């Protein structure tokens, strides 16, 4: 009899898990509610929708994100395939056309013989069936309450935000220039809006005094560091702005000058018609967003196609609830994957789906496996979110600091990259008696 698994949520983690399990002959019932009820930041009915930035971060072998993406590629990641098929210029980052990216994933999932996409809300988890909960940081209220009953723990949360997107043809190119921090060629350059000190100070004052959407009384201002609203940063420190989203470093204009501050715009789609603000996540009210952004040089007549929004991201207290296999300690049939586990970011969420699916496959075959070690980014993230020494989990992006780098002073500048690749290849070899990882498995 064909083995069967339920997966709740068809975001990046859910789709990765479904893809791997289906490629290994498991029948997957993939539940997704977005075609019936979208949350505040979902815009399309496609699966694997990128709701915040359109970049999967750095491609560098020296960077944690580059290391993790290489590990995912070795594990036949659907998300990495979709990204490479829909890549657009983005300096040293893997930037994608978000619509083509999601369509690629949707087509792969819908056309897979072993995946049954069920468009309905799951309000109660069937504990008698092997299930992966990958419902994401915006889990519906009904399912969220059911998860709370199952875990016996309060859910944690942080506030996340996304940046506005504007049309390229509404930019006055007489007042902006093209530049890149990491790439001297034309490809991958960003649109740069130069600000002198007076303009910078005026813009900061606008941000500090902007009218924001009021938080509910029970929503304390708990932000994830990588997604702090721009207005919150402005209230904190001008220096942080100048060293962060408005940094002018290496953004030299056509006259060879470096402005006091720079606002960057990054290409958002394949046909080069849309651009998003780099590092400009915001909770400012929509009319205020337009008014304030129009004070920037070259954006006097800007056309905003998507305003920045803030939303609450839920996640469970994984160290108390899950074992190393991302399996609920008190109910072995239930597994979690994605941002709801406490990883933060697109690739972190997707990679979590891959690892959870491998653990589910092992469970279905009654096989105990050794998890990837902390020499790999995948193993390090898994160790971090399931480490019982954490009293209260804080969301985590991949970073070099969580790796086990015993010989990090080794001569090779690509030591961490090489070590992680060796570890993932070792991991794949250790599971090849029951899990097939590769192209010929679709």
Curated annotation (Swiss-Prot):
Subcellular location: Cytoplasm
The EC number(s) this enzyme carries: 2.1.1.74
SUPFAM superfamilies: FAD/NAD(P)-binding domain (SSF51905)
Binding residues annotated for FAD, in chain numbering: 9-14
Record InterPro entries: FAD/NAD-bd_sf (IPR036188), MnmG-rel (IPR002218), MnmG-rel_CS (IPR020595), MnmG_N (IPR040131), TrmFO (IPR004417)
GO cellular component assignments: cytosol
Catalysis performed (reactions): uridine(54) in tRNA + (6R)-5,10-methylene-5,6,7,8-tetrahydrofolate + NADH + H(+) = 5-methyluridine(54) in tRNA + (6S)-5,6,7,8-tetrahydrofolate + NAD(+); uridine(54) in tRNA + (6R)-5,10-methylene-5,6,7,8-tetrahydrofolate + NADPH + H(+) = 5-methyluridine(54) in tRNA + (6S)-5,6,7,8-tetrahydrofolate + NADP(+)
Broad EC category: transferase
Gene Ontology molecular function terms on file: flavin adenine dinucleotide binding; tRNA (uracil(54)-C5)-methyltransferase activity, 5,10-methylenetetrahydrofolate-dependent
Cofactor: FAD
Coiled coil: none
Keywords assigned: Cytoplasm, FAD, Flavoprotein, Methyltransferase, NAD, NADP, Transferase, tRNA processing
Keyword Cell membrane: no
GO biological process: tRNA methylation; tRNA wobble uridine modification
Recorded superkingdom: Bacteria
Pfam families, sorted: GIDA
PROSITE patterns the UniProt entry points to: GIDA_2 (PS01281)
Family: Belongs to the MnmG family. TrmFO subfamily.
NCBIfam families assigned: gid_trmFO (TIGR00137), PRK05335.1 (NF003739)
Function as written in the Swiss-Prot or TrEMBL entry: Catalyzes the folate-dependent formation of 5-methyl-uridine at position 54 (M-5-U54) in all tRNAs.
Name of the protein this chain belongs to: Methylenetetrahydrofolate--tRNA-(uracil-5-)-methyltransferase TrmFO 1
Native organism: Mesoplasma florum (strain ATCC 33453 / NBRC 100688 / NCTC 11704 / L1) (Acholeplasma florum)
High-level lineage: Bacteria, Bacillati, Mycoplasmatota, Mollicutes, Entomoplasmatales
């Amino acid at each position: 009899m064909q083995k069967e698994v339920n997966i709740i949520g068809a975001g990046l983690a859910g789709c990765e898990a479904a893809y791997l399990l289906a490629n290994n002959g498991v029948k997957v019932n993939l539940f997704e509610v977005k075609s019936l009820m979208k949350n505040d930041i979902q815009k399309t009915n496609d699966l694997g929708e990128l709701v915040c930035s359109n970049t999967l971060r750095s491609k560098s072998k020296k960077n944690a994100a580059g290391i993790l993406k290489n590990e995912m590629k070795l594990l036949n990641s659907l998300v990495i395939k979709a990204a490479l098929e829909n890549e657009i210029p983005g300096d040293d980052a893997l930037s994608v056309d978000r619509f083509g990216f999601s369509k690629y994933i949707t087509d792969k999932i819908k056309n897979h013989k072993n995946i049954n996409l069920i468009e309905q809300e799951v309000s109660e988890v069937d504990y008698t069936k092997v299930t992966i909960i990958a419902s994401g940081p915006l889990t519906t209220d009904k399912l969220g309450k059911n998860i709370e009953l199952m875990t016996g723990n309060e859910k944690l949360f942080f506030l996340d935000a996304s940046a506005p997107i504007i049309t390229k043809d509404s930019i006055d190119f007489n007042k902006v220039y093209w530049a890149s921090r990491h790439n001297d060629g034309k490809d991958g350059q960003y649109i740069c809006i130069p600000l002198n000190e007076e303009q910078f100070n005026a813009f900061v004052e606008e941000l500090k005094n902007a009218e924001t959407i009021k938080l509910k009384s029970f929503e304390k201002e708990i932000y994830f560091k990588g997604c702090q609203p721009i207005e919150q940063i402005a209230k904190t420190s001008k220096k942080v702005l100048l060293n962060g989203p408005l940094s002018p470093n290496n953004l030299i204009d056509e006259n060879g000058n470096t402005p006091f501050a720079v606002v960057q715009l990054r290409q958002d789609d394949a046909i080069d018609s849309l651009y998003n603000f780099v590092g400009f996540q915001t909770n400012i009210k929509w009319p205020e967003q337009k008014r304030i952004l129009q004070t920037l040089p070259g954006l006097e007549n800007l056309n905003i196609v998507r305003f920045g929004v803030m939303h609450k991201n839920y996640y469970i207290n994984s160290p108390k609830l899950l074992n190393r296999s991302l399996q609920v300690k008190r109910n072995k049939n239930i597994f979690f994957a994605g941002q709801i586990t406490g990883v933060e970011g697109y690739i972190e969420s997707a990679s979590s789906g891959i690892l959870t699916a491998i653990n589910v496959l092992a469970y279905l075959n009654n096989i105990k496996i050794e998890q990837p070690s902390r020499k790999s980014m995948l193993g390090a993230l898994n160790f971090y979110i399931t480490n019982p020494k954490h009293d209260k989990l804080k969301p985590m992006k991949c970073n070099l600091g969580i790796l086990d780098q015993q010989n990090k002073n080794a001569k090779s500048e690509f030591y961490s990259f090489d070590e992680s690749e060796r570890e993932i290849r070792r991991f794949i070899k250790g599971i090849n008696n029951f899990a097939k990882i590769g192209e010929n498995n679709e």
